[in-house]
A protein has these predicted regions:
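Short amphipathic alpha-helical segment within the helicase RecA-like ATPase core
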Residues: 1-151, 155-158
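Flexible glycine/proline-rich, aromatic-decorated loop/lid segments
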Residues: 213-217
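Alpha-helical metal-binding/catalytic segments enriched in His/Glu/Asp
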Residues: 97, 152-154, 163, 167-211
């Protein structure tokens, strides 16, 4: 997009051994490099939206589709992290993840602050108590494998805004206060990517989402 391009056409190498890695690399490079977070910009740059491959066989097409699917979730993850903390509260994060995950048949379970207290999640409850935005506990279950298959567990840190609490971060750390939910965004996006590709595995992702911020009220 730095060149102002919105589309590109690429001729795939004729040698079969190069077709799949070539199309995979081009797809990932184009998708990831063209990502932009323009939500709050009055003047938005043109988006790169189309990449056309010539002479790609069925295997290369399959690799391209898989790469596109993964890159979509990588960019979804990036958009969650890029969103400002005043918007991406624990509840909004939970609702956003749930809406996207359920579209691909992923089981979603969200605990509110009352359930968090009842289940004895004291650390999550304690951190979230200082904020006006209560915490959420998120569980995603993707059941793509058989019941006898081992289950992969993923855990991601979900502090949607981390001021440092009573010990405020210095000015140099303020730009990154909203980034402490990157782990949560990554594991949730990974589960969604697995479900989109219908991988034959079982995955559970667990996220404790909260704000480490002292409410002025």
């Amino acid at each position: 997009y730095r060149l102002g391009l919105t589309s590109a056409s690429v001729s795939v190498p004729k040698e079969n051994r190069y077709k799949q890695p070539f199309t995979k690399g081009m797809t990932e490079g184009g998708s990831l490099a063209s990502y932009q977070f323009n939500t709050y910009k009055s003047v938005k740059k043109q988006e790169f939206s189309e990449l056309i491959f010539f002479e790609a066989d069925s295997k290369a097409r399959k690799v391209t589709e898989e790469s596109c699917s993964v890159c979509e979730e990588v960019n979804f993850c990036r958009s969650l992290v890029d969103e400002i903390g005043a918007v991406m509260t624990p509840k909004v994060f939970a609702d956003t993840i749930t809406g996207r995950a359920q579209a691909y048949g992923i089981e979603c379970e969200i605990w509110d602050e009352k359930r968090i207290h009842e289940e004895g999640l004291g650390a999550l409850e304690a951190v979230g108590k200082g904020s006006a935005n209560p915490p959420r506990f998120i569980i995603l279950r993707y059941n793509g494998g058989s019941d006898s298959e081992k289950r992969l567990g993923l855990v991601g840190k979900g502090v949607t805004y981390d001021t440092g609490g009573y010990c405020l971060k210095p000015g140099a750390g303020m730009m990154d206060m909203k980034d402490d939910m990157g782990g949560a965004a990554a594991v949730c996006s990974a589960v969604i990517a697995a479900a989109k590709q219908k991988l034959k595995i079982n995955i559970t992702a667990v996220v404790g989402a909260c704000e480490n911020s002292i409410d002025a009220g």
